A protein has these predicted regions:
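HotDog/MaoC-like acyl-thioester-processing domains
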Residues: 70, 80-122
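A generic structural signal for short beta-strands and their flanking turns/coil linkers
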Residues: 6-8, 56-60, 72-76, 86-88, ...
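Conserved N-terminal beta-strand and adjoining loop/helix that marks the start
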Residues: 31-35
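Hydrophobic beta-strand-centered segment that forms part of the acyl-chain substrate-binding groove
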Residues: 43-75
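Short, residue-level hotspots on alpha-helical faces of the histone-fold
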Residues: 36-40, 44
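Generic structural detector for well-ordered beta-strands
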Residues: 9-13, 63, 108-110
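Catalytic strand-loop segment that frames the active site of acyl-thioester-processing enzymes
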Residues: 1-29
Length: 122
C-alpha cells in the first residue's frame, strides 16, 4: 500500500476563487479549494475499500505556495506515505501546468464503517 497514489487534473473554475469562497478578495485559486482538491485526491487513493467502508479526513498540514488564475490547469497527486491500523498518511502536492508547486503537505485519513460513523452523529 505504501507509495500507492492517485492523480487528477482540474481547471480552476470561478467558484473556487478566494473572492467567491470568502477567504480573500482576489480572483485566484483559493486555499480552501486547494485543500479540498488534495483531500479529494487522497480519498480516491482509497477508492477500492469494501462496501460499507469509507475514509474520512482527520488532519491536513499544507502550505499554499503560489497563486493560480481562473482557467489554469492544476495537477494534484496524493501518495500513501504510511499506514497504521485504520490510519493512512499521505503526501499531497499540487502543481500548475508549468510544473511549479502551488501547494504541498501531508494529510491523514482514517477508515470508518459508514453505518457506525453516521449512527454516532444522530
Amino acid at each position: 500500500m505504501i507509495n500507492k497514489s492517485f492523480s487528477q487534473t482540474i481547471v480552476v473554475p470561478e467558484n473556487q476563487t478566494a473572492i467567491f469562497l470568502g477567504s480573500g478578495i482576489l480572483p485566484v485559486f483559493a486555499t480552501p479549494a486547494m485543500i479540498a482538491l488534495m483531500e479529494n485526491t487522497a480519498m480516491k487513493v482509497l477508492s477500492d475499500l469494501p462496501e460499507g467502508k469509507t475514509s474520512v479526513g482527520i488532519s491536513m498540514n499544507t502550505n499554499h505556495l503560489k497563486a493560480c488564475l481562473v482557467g489554469e490547469k492544476i495537477h494534484c497527486k496524493a501518495t500513501i506515505l504510511s499506514f497504521e491500523g485504520r490510519k493512512y498518511t499521505f503526501h499531497v502536492i499540487a502543481t500548475n501546468e508549468n510544473g511549479d508547486i502551488i501547494g504541498e503537505g501531508t494529510h491523514e485519513r482514517v477508515i470508518v464503517d459508514v453505518e457506525k460513523f453516521m449512527s454516532k452523529l444522530k
